[in-house]
Amino acid sequence: MKEKYFFVIRKLLLIFFLFFLFVDVKSQTNFENWSVFDIAGKVKNNIELKFEYKNKYSHENSQLRSSHVDFGVSYKINKLTIGGFYREIYERKKESRVSEFRPHLDFSYKFNDNLKLRFRNEYRIKELSDNAFRFRFRSSYSLNIWDNFNPFFQNEIFISKKQLVRDRVSLGINIKINNTPFKIKPSYLLEANRKSSENTVDWSYRHVLLIAFNIRF
């Protein structure tokens, strides 16, 4: 059984490496680095506080494209977790720096140690355009083979104004550091964004190398 899992991990690592190689050589103009730092801790048995910071660096423009802070509280009921959060985003568009404020509700359900689903309902308060609701649905699957080294796969779709506007697919590794509250999660992410005009619908693609640093108390 262990040999079978080891074979699967080798294939996943090979795919991850090939994706990264393809991005690095072929798609520099659509390549970004995302860094995430989040910290969470329980204040009671079923109540958790969380803070997150993320930035996105664009190699196309050689600058930080956007950053955000996100904080809130979640409550766990058996396999269901409900959370209320607030996000503040700053993004560069051409020569301007614009802001967006985004309260959101999260509903997560953990079926087992491998499969988890999350639904997010967010209200986008934009500086330069109309405010709008957006819905996000993410499925996560992990191979829990060892205690501190587990590959994972995620797919998240974004729906706004009854249309699919974005899709994110990611493949990575969850690394736990023994005897500490720290985790490191490097991953490759492919993001597809809908581009619509009066008569046509097109999609643009962004390749991302994402590294997340997590602390859980």
Each PLM stretch: what is its role?
Residues 53-59, 77-79, 86-92, 111, ...:
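Transmembrane beta-strands of outer-membrane beta-barrel pores
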Residues 31-35, 65-69, 99-103, 131-135, ...:
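Residues that define the transmembrane beta-barrel architecture of outer-membrane proteins
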Residues 43-51, 79-84, 113-117, 147-151, ...:
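Repeated loop/turn-to-beta-strand initiation elements of outer-membrane beta-barrel proteins
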Residues 28-85, 90-92:
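Start-of-domain marker
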Residues 94-118:
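Ordered, amphipathic secondary-structure segments that act as subunit-interaction surfaces
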Residues 1-33, 217:
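Bacterial Sec-dependent N-terminal signal peptides
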Residues 110, 114-157:
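Detector for outer-membrane/organellar transmembrane beta-barrel domains
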Residues 107, 173-179, 205-217:
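Outer-membrane beta-barrel "beta-signal"
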